[in-house]
Amino acid sequence: MLKRLRKNHPLIYCIGAEAVFLGSLFVSSYLVVIALLLFRFNFAYADDYLLGCIQELVGIGVAVVLLRRTGKAQLLTRRGCGFFNGLLVGMYPAALLAYNLYAKLLFGLPADGTLLPLWRILCFFANMMLVGVAEEFLFRGVVAETLLEHFGTSRGGIWKACLLSGVLFGCAHLTNLFTSAPLGVLMQCVFATSLGVLYGAIYFRTGNLWVTVFLHGGMDVLSMLVGGLYGTETVAESVSGYDITMLSSVLVYL
């Protein structure tokens, strides 16, 4: 059934896959909260990033099931041009990651801040990298691959697949309207769309999902590095802080 839907109605399949993926994240978060309430857990000791890890593991499971049910599980192990050669293809975003890390470590860390406990820092890194795994499996492995097969591998077909998969990736961030300021979420959606187009192009060129997983996870780590190390802000607060000036960063990726 999923194979037929993917072949005959690829856009409906992609939108449906995204809806199921996002729905699974919401449902899993509520189930975790309900379970903690049943066990009378003290939420003062809860860690958002640990809960986020559980969510993303569910999302990874959904993406893997979709790939397996449509006969595309081999994408998870396809080497393409190889991981390190793939990073050379993605050299531009990789170089930006290195520069942003340098800037964060040199200028972005609070002088009088206190590091969070090690287990919470590890949860932060794990959560951010798992976001990269889950979203790349879904938006590049499921969505972008489906659109590429539909539009074809001509120059125009690749552009259409990159642009449409990028838009779907950007729209997925509208779910943050539940927790963050509307303007910040809108800016995040625009930025995520541009990144989605870029990651799609890198994925098509390299044929290796793990290249974009690494770049995506690294970007998420750097975007929340100070908050993850020192607990100075949450993801929702960070997104709420995005403003119109963020549009200038979109030009860098285009």
Predicted regions located by residue number:
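Transmembrane alpha-helix boundary signature
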Residues: 68-73, 97-110
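Aromatic-anchored segments of alpha-helical transmembrane domains
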Residues: 22-30, 94-102, 166-175, 217-229
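Short, Lys/Arg-rich, polar N-terminal cytosolic tail immediately upstream
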Residues: 1-8
